[in-house]
Regions:
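Conserved beta-strand-loop-beta-strand hairpin that lines the nucleotide-binding pocket
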Residues: 1-39, 88-165
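Conserved short strand/loop->alpha-helix "switch" segment adjacent to the catalytic nucleotide/phosphoryl-transfer site
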Residues: 56-81
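Extended, non-globular alpha-helical segments
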Residues: 33-61
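Short, well-structured hydrophobic secondary-structure segments
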Residues: 79, 85-89
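Short amphipathic alpha-helical interaction segments
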Residues: 44, 83, 128-129
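Conserved terminal C-lobe alpha helix of the protein kinase catalytic domain
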Residues: 46-49, 53, 77, 81, ...
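Short, structured helix-loop boundary elements
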Residues: 45, 49, 69-73, 134
């Protein structure tokens, strides 16, 4: 079951520690990280999905050679859609989408300026639209959570999914 564990303000997830600033470290981080600014853009959800699809292609997740790999890629695209949509509906829109891959997982981060706290709700009426986003995220991800932006309004909602085997 996923949790919204409290994190330190400087917790930015895997791949950010160590020798940041060194040319090799910056090059390696760029290879495993993709960043998309979303502030003031229109068509944000399809743009985020297209950006993520291209990253998955660059990283060899797509085109999928097996049903399991295809399902893993579809899960990533669905979670990106849900997190970005949630930021649009409840936080004034997303500012940035960050994708970080490791050999075992993919971490998605959506930064927004909102003060609310996302929480999964058990769908009361499974056949009706709306209110299912964080429930879907909780079901598909290894873990997810929220990192607050210190004294300022805003947060980063992150989710981790298993890499395809």
């Amino acid at each position: 079951m996923s949790t919204t564990r409290p994190s330190a303000a400087d917790d930015r997830g895997p791949g950010t520690g160590g020798s940041a600033g060194a040319p090799e470290a910056e090059s390696r981080e760029a290879e495993f990280t993709r960043r998309l600014r979303l502030t003031g853009e229109s068509g944000i959800v399809p743009r985020a999905r297209d950006f993520t699809r291209q990253a998955l292609h660059d990283w060899g997740w797509l085109p999928a050679a097996t049903d399991d790999r295809r399902a893993a890629a579809e899960d990533v695209l669905l979670v990106v859609s849900e997190l970005v949509t949630n930021a649009c509906l409840h936080a004034g829109g997303p500012e940035e989408l960050l994708l970080r891959r490791s050999p075992k997982s993919l971490r998605l981060e959506v930064v927004d300026g909102g003060g609310g706290e996302p929480a999964p709700r058990t769908p009361h009426r499974a056949g009706r639209p709306g209110g299912h986003g964080m429930f879907i995220v909780q079901r598909l991800c290894l873990d997810w959570g929220v990192i607050r932006s210190g004294d300022q309004p805003g947060k980063t909602v992150w989710a981790e999914l298993a890499a395809p085997s």
